[in-house]
Design a protein with these regions (language model features):
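C-terminal beta-strand-rich structural cap/linker in extracellular carbohydrate-active enzymes
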Residues: 572-593
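Bacterial Sec-dependent N-terminal signal peptides
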Residues: 15-36
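Aromatic-lined carbohydrate-binding/catalytic grooves of carbohydrate-active enzymes
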Residues: 147-148, 152-194, 218-233, 259-262, ...
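Active-site-adjacent "subsite" loops/lids of carbohydrate-active enzymes
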Residues: 122-128, 136-141, 212, 216-281
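An acidic-aromatic substrate-binding cleft motif
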Residues: 113-167
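Carbohydrate-binding surface patches
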Residues: 481-547, 587
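Aromatic/acidic polysaccharide-binding cleft in carbohydrate-active enzymes
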Residues: 380-473
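Active-site neighborhood of glycoside hydrolase catalytic domains
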Residues: 262-349, 355-367
Length: 593
């Protein structure tokens, strides 16, 4: 949670003028032009080894179609398509990504008309893909299923329940023995226990982990009536006269008054409140929020200066000890507290809320965060809370800019990360219920392909720690071409195609990320003016490899539904030459040893 400005508070007052304005029947992801014919889906976001996969089509394609089951470009099995619903038993090996493809002969040419990724993993933190929920009004079972089915199609395996709680210092409404059926959240929206529980049950059915959201060190203005001791609070003066707070205006019910996370009394109090949550709702864990760097020096009740971030590591460790079977994720706002605290604590993965953005550093901010997190955490994965088209969303209702979203998603994915994007709507602001921007049908189709691609090739994009140590597998690769296109080693440059190399045990992976037509190089695309990248085909490229390969193939989420295409190649004098079938936003070349 960033320090929300008064400008946004005034904006929220206009947008959220009634307690239940954001409802699932206004969901921009599900309806309208976003219908996709021949959409291939699975019954779960992820599967345990040994589980069968149920596949389904929303409409049957005409003519003869072949189902092909693949792993990293190799065909495991293929069979004629005979039904709109069927099952497949993946291999038993753990932590593997697969792609199921539908092939059809179109005018004498093999075309992939649909595909879907499949993640087989016993532990979700190996390949985390975060989504969110933010509205808990009265909902039918079918409404809940519709939202979760959308998240399932993006293979979301962690769902964080934003703004579900009653009070920051008392998240469960009522008591463990008498929980409320209906309560109001921080902005006075009605939340229903049946909806929260329905979402938890539905998420579990789809193989998703559920995390309840709450700030780790905050309370509302009525904290004294709930036995919060003033000695547990954080102050802006040494005489404990002024409580530090996160100001929120109307329509929010209260400012958030901040507590001292070092204080054992506060820790014990909040742990007891969390135990109440777990006794009523079978959440799988807690997504802990923070507020980043405080704008002024803060003190404890005795007048001692508080270093807020230095409490994060021990706080997380204590929470894990108290509830060892529950998962923990903690937000690092602008990386505050990540190094030496959060990253090395018992969190499932590193979660960074990204606020730094510029045309100068651009997409390189993502690569720096992801590699830093890997170093600081001994190889944990990274999820980025990166709010795209931010200023565009503040202007009011509108549409996401598809090229900007794709280019940010491609950069994060190529570097082994993922962006928190999908919920009842796509995310554009740190106040998660804000649904000002709508996905176009084009963007929804693209995001499905990109999430499928990230899952199908997860073993190449998010591999296990290399023998040489964390981040030792990345390398610079110089790509040349006899075409008019210019390639450069990462970071991105305008009018060029950036390259990233990665040495894996049995192959080298070369990523090509196109900025040929880029309006700018700012990942946020805050005003929504990033230009689309044109699709170009048959680009000859050459680059150095350490030895003659055994096989070379290419895949991109922008062409042939992400399916791998084996290509012809020539090797001479340490140089590999091949023709890349297509480049639009992101293409991956795999050179098998």
């Amino acid at each position: 949670m960033k320090r929300m400005s008064l400008i946004y508070i005034l904006f929220a007052a206009l947008v959220i003028s009634s307690c239940n304005i954001i409802e699932p029947d206004n969901d921009p992801v599900t309806y309208g032009e976003s219908y996709i014919p021949n959409l291939l889906s699975t019954d779960k976001a992820a599967y345990k080894p040994g589980e069968k996969v149920t596949l389904s089509l929303n409409s049957m394609p005409e003519g003869s179609v072949t189902v092909r089951y693949t792993h990293l470009g190799k065909i495991l099995k293929q069979e004629p398509l005979s039904s709109s619903r069927w099952t497949w038993q993946p291999p038993a090996e753990d932590f593997q990504g697969y792609m199921v493809e539908l092939h059809k002969n179109v005018n004498g040419r093999d075309e992939v008309i649909s595909s879907v990724g499949i993640d087989v993993s016993s532990e979700p933190s190996r390949f985390p893909r975060n989504g969110f929920l933010s509205t808990y009004g009265k909902m039918s079972a079918s409404d809940i299923a519709n939202v979760l089915n959308d998240l399932n199609r993006y293979h979301i395996n962690y769902v964080q329940f934003q703004d579900w709680h009653w009070k920051h210092h008392h998240p469960l409404a009522g008591s463990a023995t008498q929980p409320m059926d209906v309560w109001t959240d921080i902005i006075s929206r009605n939340c229903y226990r049946s909806t929260v529980q329905g979402y938890i049950d539905g998420a579990h059915k789809r193989g998703m982990v559920t995390l309840f959201y709450n700030l780790g060190y905050g309370c509302l203005e009525d904290y004294a009536t709930d036995d919060v001791n003033p000695e547990w609070l954080m102050y802006t003066d040494k005489l404990h006269t002024h409580v530090d707070n996160h100001p929120l205006g109307s329509p929010f019910k209260s400012a958030i008054y901040l507590t001292d996370l070092h204080n054992d009394g506060w820790r014990d109090y909040l742990r007891a409140r969390n135990d109440e949550v777990y006794s009523v709702f079978n959440f799988d864990g807690w997504q802990i929020d923070q507020l980043g760097v405080r704008p002024t020096t803060v003190y404890d009740y005795s007048g001692n200066v508080i270093d807020v971030q230095s409490a994060f590591g021990s706080f997380i460790a204590n929470e894990k000890t108290a509830q060892p079977n529950k998962r923990i994720v903690m937000n690092a706002v602008g990386q505050y507290g990540q190094q030496g605290q959060i990253a090395s604590a018992p969190v499932d993965f590193c979660y960074t809320e990204v606020w730094e953005h510029s045309n100068t550093d651009g997409y390189g901010i993502f690569s720096r965060i992801i590699t830093d997190n890997a170093n600081w955490s001994n190889g944990k994965q990274t999820v980025l809370a990166a709010y795209l088209n931010y200023d565009l969303g503040l202007k009011g209702r509108g549409y996401f800019n598809t090229p900007g979203i794709i280019m940010a998603t491609a950069a994060a994915s190529a570097w082994g990360g993922t962006i928190l994007q999908m919920g009842e709507h796509m995310l554009c602001h740190e106040y998660f219920p804000d649904d000002n921007l709508t996905m176009t049908g084009e963007l929804k189709r693209a995001m499905i392909r990109y999430y499928d691609f990230a899952v199908a090739y997860e073993n190449l994009l998010r591999p296990a720690t290399p023998a040489g140590g964390i981040n030792s597998d990345w390398y610079g690769v110089d790509v040349t071409s006899t075409s008019d296109y210019v390639f450069n080693q990462w970071g991105p440059k305008a009018n060029q195609i950036a390259t990233i190399g990665r040495h894996l045990d049995d192959c080298d992976v070369i990523h090509l990320l196109s900025y040929r037509n880029a309006t700018h190089l700012d990942w946020c695309d805050s005003d929504g003016d990033q230009a689309p990248q044109s699709l170009v085909k048959d680009i000859p490229v050459s680059f150095a490899v350490s030895a003659q390969p055994s096989r070379v193939w290419v895949a991109t989420p922008d062409y042939q539904q992400g399916a791998a295409q084996e290509v012809a190649w020539e090797y001479a004098g340490g140089q590999l030459t091949l023709t890349v079938p297509a480049i639009q936003y992101w293409t991956m070349i795999v050179v098998e040893k």
